[in-house]
Amino acid sequence: MINKNDIVADIVIDYPKAADIFRSVGIDFCCGGQVSIEAASLEKKNVDLNELLQRLNDVEQTNTPGSLNPKFLNVSSLIQYIQAAYHEPLREEFKNLTPYVTKLSKVHGPNHPYLVELKETYDTFKSGMLEHMQKEDDVDFPKLIKYEQGEVVNDINTVIDDLVSDHIATGQLLVKMSDLTSSYEPPIEACGTWRLVYQRLKALEVLTHEHVHLENHVLFKKVS
C-alpha cells in the first residue's frame, strides 16, 4: 500500500501510470521527485493528501500484471526502449512542430511579445535536447552499456552527473515555457495555430518529463 512517506519518483518507477496523477495536481515526479508524497503535497495549496493517496492506491490495485515496466529491463534493453519511445519521437516532433511555433511568433508576436520569447525559449530547448540526445546515443549510452558488461569506465559518475545537470536545465526551460503560456492555456482570441502550438507544447512537456524521469530514476540507478 502506498503511504505518505513513499518517495514520489519511486512510486512512478513502480507504477508508471501514477505519473498522470502527480501531473494532474502539479507535483514534479521528474527532477524534483526525490521527496515524500506528503512533502510534495504540502507544497501545493489545493492538494488533499488523503485524496491523493487514495488515487495512487487505486492505481496500485489496478496495475496490470505482465505489462511492461521499464525498471525490469537491463541497461542495454532500457536504452533501446528510451531511444525508441522518446528520442526518435522527440526528434520527429521537433521537426514537425517548429514551423508552427515560428509562424505563431511571426504573426502574433508583434502584438503579444511573450510569443516571441516563447519561440526563443523553445528554440533553446529544442537545440539543447537534440544535442543532448545525440550525445547520449553516440557517447554516453555506449559507456553505460560497457559498464553493465563489466568493463572499466572511469568517468561513469561524471557522465551521469553531467546528464543530470542537462536534465535540470531542460526542466527549467519547460517551466519557463509553461509560465509564458499560463500553463498552455490559450487566450479566448487564439487562432487554430495558436491552440495547436500550445496543445503540442504541453504534450512535449509530458513526454520530456517521462523521458527524464526514466533516465534519472531508473537507468542511471542501474549503473551507480
Curated annotation (Swiss-Prot):
HAMAP family reported for this sequence: RIC_ScdA
Lineage top rank: taxon: Bacteria
Transmembrane feature ranges: none
Gene Ontology CC annotations of this record: cytoplasm
Protein localization: Cytoplasm
Function statement: Di-iron-containing protein involved in the repair of iron-sulfur clusters damaged by oxidative and nitrosative stress conditions.
Keyword Metal-binding: yes
One GO molecular-function entry: metal ion binding
UniProt xrefs under InterPro entries: Hemerythrin-like, RIC_family, ScdA, ScdA-like_N_sf
Encoding gene (name): scdA
Name of protein: Iron-sulfur cluster repair protein ScdA
GO biological process, one term: response to oxidative stress
Assigned protein family: Belongs to the RIC family. ScdA subfamily.
Assembly, per entry: Homodimer.
Keywords: Cytoplasm, Iron, Metal-binding, Stress response
Disulfide-bonded cysteines: none
Organism: Staphylococcus aureus (strain JH9)
